[in-house]
């Protein structure tokens, strides 16, 4: 997967939060997105993943322009925000199947078990999300992403 950001900008009223940022990430690259609080990291990630409309510029994921093909972009990229929005009354397996069905992603029992194993949730998979530690809740969010 490649990501290309060109002159991406976002304003909240008169405050410029992201100002013409440009970068590209090639398939297979691992990068860190660092900066002080309020620097625009989360805002930039929300624009790249299609959860927030940019005021200027463009972001492409796998050659797909985010604001034009928002749903297709979301099917190509997972995003786990710091404040992980989970339905805590659901069981882990139930939640993963639910999220998959919302995004039209394969939710066979075999696929869900594969994801559970990959993120290290095997021993927690039969529990309600409300019973999990913060770390395991993050893993559920990662599995859902």
Predicted region positions:
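ABC transporter nucleotide-binding domains
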Residues: 3, 10-145
């Amino acid at each position: 997967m490649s990501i290309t950001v060109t002159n991406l900008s976002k304003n909240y009223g008169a405050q410029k939060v992201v100002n013409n940022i440009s970068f590209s990430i090639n398939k297979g690259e691992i990068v860190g997105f660092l900066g002080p609080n309020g620097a625009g990291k989360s805002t930039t990630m929300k624009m790249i993943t299609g959860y927030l409309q940019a005021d200027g510029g463009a972001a492409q994921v796998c050659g797909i322009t985010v604001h034009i093909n928002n749903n297709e972009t979301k099917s190509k990229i997972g995003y786990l925000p710091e404040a992980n929005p989970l339905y805590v009354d659901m069981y882990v397996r139930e939640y993963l199947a639910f999220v998959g069905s919302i995004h039209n992603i394969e939710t066979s029992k075999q696929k869900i078990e594969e994801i559970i194993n990959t993120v290290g949730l095997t021993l927690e998979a039969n529990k309600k999300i409300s019973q999990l530690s913060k770390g395991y809740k993050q893993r559920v969010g990662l599995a859902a992403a």
